[in-house]
Amino acid sequence: MTEKQLNDKILCKIKKGDTMQVVKNHNSEYPIGILWNMGNKYAREMMLKIAIMEDVLQVKILDLGKDYEQFVLDCYERDEEAYEGGYIYEKIKNMNTDNKRIVVFIFNVDNPTYQQAEDGKIQCIEARQVKQRIRKEYASKIDEYFFDNLIHISDNVEEAKRTLNTVNKYDKYTIGNYVRKGYKSILNESTKCQSKSYVSFLENLRGDKDERE
């Protein structure tokens, strides 16, 4: 079953019956998350909390340099809402600091549940819970916090696939890569940057400054 077929199947089940808002699907979901550079001081701490909530399978650090802005635009290319009113450009302006390092991670959700948003978008409930908890606990710690400039997590299979393709396009910027023992790499695997633990290379981000350019 393709990603689109899976999402269509979920959507049909959600729409069946006026009271049915949530559906279980017994396949696994592999949401892709991004910890934006604004939160690097807390990246290690946030990843450890995420690992308590869900099984983290892979963690990468990308140092995007001059291609940082284009990476953000590519991530939200299919998100019309992000472009309305110039929101995406305000987001980039807020996040465009002298530090261009981001953390990309993948985790596993077994037996995920889904809901349909008001705009019709299918959302993995467990993935959204991770995102909402991190925002709730860390938004107040970020100087000049601007909504969504801390963490991004894919909401469904199709969005995860698009994010995966985007991240893999920028694989040359990888400076750290961890794959959980016993699992195959989902993101492109950069063996030259391989690490047995993501805790150590995330620790190195704590000193990152976030002065706006």
Each model region followed by its residue ranges:
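Non-catalytic terminal and connector segments of soluble metabolic enzymes
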Residues: 2-205
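Catalytic metal-binding acidic patch
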Residues: 209-213
